[in-house]
């Protein structure tokens, strides 16, 4: 099962230094003047320089077939930067570029190709710095401090466009129809692709392509574009441009998982942890007015308050949603954490998950069957673990080289401070008692007697997310736990990576000379106080997993130094993000869903009420991408995730799955 892996480009460089595909026997760009051809065919062909100053929305969306070396994207980014410098007061402030690539270049080849265009170096270097691994699905790159978003979809465009969420329909303002020539790559240039382009095109959207092949022109016309021939670039006689003049009604393919956003960009976030902080930052970058209400006197007093938390993905070969979501979330988290202009304690030292017994080794074997790139997950034997971690474990495992640890409390506080400098309003000591929807707004009442009114509300308050009448039926549950803080020893200070077993142990934090070891697990428990039994249990689990390891016996928990917290989890180990579903209306509207899928109504939700929760023990890995997904949804922008995986993150998923099978929810 290797659904995540894609084949990198198989190329060589010709005498002119131009990359040539060995598989398609075609150049990636013109030997003569690829840069000028891109400007002529795609920028002028779509009239972008004239359209940018008049664009009525804050974001312009371009979609492309065939990313290749990124020449089209870099050229457009350069032009967009010039537009912003010339028109700083224009409505258009952000560029969103969506590109599909079946055979992505490896980073080394990308860098070599970019040497052709020194005038694009300042943009190319930023792309190279975030260039993703060859994993299938969507890689979101946030560039130029979020002003430019690049969604790289790795895989076959004809398959990927079928997997896009309905929320992407009619979002594209301009199409760059590129790729290897139709004669060299006929599979891509299909009626299927042309229909997908039409579905994604906003009414009034344009397209341009270098080819003038008759079947391409006819196929695009049949899909709904008005097409015309134009003079081609240089020695090419003709090319094609087109306009989507129609406004087609597009029925939802899975209305029970429909996602909706808002026109009014004002919201309140309830919470105070890492999810709240990152969501606030993502919304502010999109021009939202955001107010954060935190029940505690300071940020990160809940599950995000630990001194050290491990960053690594949850892997499973048994659940496609998990195997698609977590590698994407993990790689996005690393890109975001490295790019954030904040300071916090962290060390990307790697994480090693150990197969200390037969059952845990079987679990690791099925993780490795995913065939992920070694930069994400790689098998390691006992000697390699000793070499990598500094401590003997007498067992094999799986290593996450890009993982490590960070201080969630410091990161959360730093991101909130950064968001405040961008306009975030924060109120501490505001515990939300109730919220009610009246006359188009949400009325909030807090336990300190204060009231507030907001256009929309996001619940991101950990295990308290189900405290309200609108959310009390959500299938989530609290998990209390205790993390022990232990002093280092001559043996423990050798530990260079995070160790995960039937618990976890971090390398020492140089700021305090302590390690974190944890964590106990008490399902259903919301009131957590220091427990000596939990303290001893954290130590004993380590000793039990490695009975021959003398270093494990050195762990000293006698200081009674620990931190308690409560996580929020789900039965299927996936978080929940999106509109808050209306439970009673869902049961009423979908009581016969199994027989009436063709006539099903859009998912019943509370208008303007959203949630980001149930992150379990993987919030450091998942919060960045979940915040980006929700900010995109709320802003009615393209969402960086396929529809099947998004369905696996939908807050109503467990109810709908039963209803689709004709089973009772209650």
From Swiss-Prot:
It is found in: Cytoplasm. One of its GO terms (cellular component) is cytoplasm. The keyword DNA repair does not apply. Residues 1-245 are annotated as: tRNA (mnm(5)s(2)U34)-methyltransferase. It comes from the Bacteria. Its EC number is 2.1.1.61, 1.5.-.-. One of its GO terms (biological process) is methylation. It holds the Pfam family Methyltransf_30. GO terms for molecular function: flavin adenine dinucleotide binding; oxidoreductase activity, acting on the CH-NH group of donors; tRNA (5-methylaminomethyl-2-thiouridylate)(34)-methyltransferase activity. It catalyses: 5-aminomethyl-2-thiouridine(34) in tRNA + S-adenosyl-L-methionine = 5-methylaminomethyl-2-thiouridine(34) in tRNA + S-adenosyl-L-homocysteine + H(+). Its cofactor is FAD. Keywords: Cytoplasm, FAD, Flavoprotein, Methyltransferase, Multifunctional enzyme, Oxidoreductase, S-adenosyl-L-methionine, Transferase, tRNA processing. Coiled coil: none annotated. Disulfide bonds: none annotated. InterPro entries: FAD-dep_OxRdtase, FAD/NAD-bd_sf, MnmC-like_methylTransf, SAM-dependent_MTases_sf, tRNA_MAMT_biosynth_bifunc_MnmC, tRNA_MNMC2, tRNA_S-uridine_synth_MnmC_C. SUPFAM superfamilies: FAD-linked reductases, C-terminal domain, FAD/NAD(P)-binding domain. Residues 270-666 are annotated as: FAD-dependent cmnm(5)s(2)U34 oxidoreductase. Its main location: cytoplasm. Catalyzes the last two steps in the biosynthesis of 5-methylaminomethyl-2-thiouridine (mnm(5)s(2)U) at the wobble position (U34) in tRNA. Catalyzes the FAD-dependent demodification of cmnm(5)s(2)U34 to nm(5)s(2)U34, followed by the transfer of a methyl group from S-adenosyl-L-methionine to nm(5)s(2)U34, to form mnm(5)s(2)U34. In the N-terminal section; belongs to the methyltransferase superfamily. tRNA (mnm(5)s(2)U34)-methyltransferase family. In the C-terminal section; belongs to the DAO family. PANTHER family: SARCOSINE DEHYDROGENASE-RELATED, TRNA 5-METHYLAMINOMETHYL-2-THIOURIDINE BIOSYNTHESIS BIFUNCTIONAL PROTEIN MNMC. This is tRNA 5-methylaminomethyl-2-thiouridine biosynthesis bifunctional protein MnmC. It comes from Enterobacter sp. (strain 638). The gene is mnmC.
